[in-house]
């Protein structure tokens, strides 16, 4: 009976040693750190790699140092100009001090989520609707700064905050659609008015030129008649003013005088 008893005791001792070694050996990945507690007191952070702790007397809490993505659930709030909105966001953060993340707050992920929700409601409540829709980058930076300052004592670094979706009441959406349509019509009217102004300016310049050179209008009229007459299918009926007839007579007389001078030169 002595042999079985010794075998049983040896087995128990070996099993205890294996359990002791399994509890003493710790392997921490490259992106992790182990916060070591000895008899309830923090003695520091270890890792990455292999290390040993004293079971029963020491305890290791593993902390992930990678950037984590935290979805902030939809928050219902009212903007500064009294427009009810539903907004959600996403927060990117990482642990930079694992000891603080373990000792300064019970659950740093939940705490970061809660502070992100309250900050989102606060910032949106201080902004106008136009800012929320058109200056989202500015609000993102403001959110990132406030949340980062609030979580800094926990060893957390907030790297970015992005507002994802902004939901407006149906009535507000229709009103904004009408406003956008009115804005497009206003711009179209401004463009048309500018074109008419430029056309009027050109007409004014032309009128000034014609008033300074009356013959220019008559020559332009003759050019137009010539262009129309080039098409043989057109039948032209002209009601010419006296000034135009006088112009024709002057041109005819000038042509006759010129022809007479040419003949005299030939005789000489």
From Swiss-Prot:
Disulfide partners: none
Entry-linked SMART domains: PHB
Coiled-coil regions listed in the entry: 125-152, 178-213
UniProt keyword list: Coiled coil, Membrane, Transmembrane, Transmembrane helix
Membrane association type: Single-pass membrane protein
An annotated GO cellular component: plasma membrane
Main localization (coarse): membrane
Subcellular locations according to the entry: Membrane
Pfam families: Band_7
Regions crossing the membrane: 1-21
Subunit structure comment from the entry: Homotrimer.
Family: Belongs to the band 7/mec-2 family.
Protein name: Stomatin homolog PYRAB06580
Species lineage: Archaea, Methanobacteriati, Methanobacteriota, Thermococci, Thermococcales
């Amino acid at each position: 009976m002595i042999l079985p008893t010794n075998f049983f005791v040896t087995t128990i001792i070996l099993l205890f040693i294996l359990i002791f070694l399994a509890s003493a050996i710790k392997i921490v990945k490259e992106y992790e750190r182990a916060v070591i507690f000895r008899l309830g007191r923090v003695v520091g952070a270890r890792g990455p790699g292999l290390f040993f702790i004293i079971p029963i007397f020491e305890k290791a809490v593993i902390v992930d140092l990678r950037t984590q993505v935290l979805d902030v659930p939809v928050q219902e709030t009212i903007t500064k100009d009294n427009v009810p909105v539903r907004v959600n966001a996403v927060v990117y953060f990482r642990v930079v001090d694992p000891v603080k993340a373990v000792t300064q707050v019970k659950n740093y992920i939940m705490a970061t989520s809660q502070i992100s929700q309250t900050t989102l409601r606060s910032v949106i409540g201080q902004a106008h609707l136009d800012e929320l829709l058109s200056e989202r980058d500015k609000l993102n930076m403001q959110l990132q700064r406030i949340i980062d300052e609030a979580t800094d004592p926990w060893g957390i670094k907030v790297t970015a905050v992005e507002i994802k979706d902004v939901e407006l009441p149906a009535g507000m959406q229709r009103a904004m659609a009408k406003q956008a349509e009115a804005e497009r019509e206003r711009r179209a009217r401004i463009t048309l008015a500018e074109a008419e102004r430029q056309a009027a300016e050109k007409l004014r310049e032309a009128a000034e030129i014609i008033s300074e050179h009356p013959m220019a209008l008559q020559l332009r009229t003759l050019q137009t008649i010539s262009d129309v007459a080039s098409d043989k299918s057109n039948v032209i009926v002209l009601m010419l003013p006296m000034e135009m007839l006088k112009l024709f007579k002057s041109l005819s007389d000038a042509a006759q005088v010129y022809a007479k001078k040419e003949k005299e030169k030939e005789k000489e």
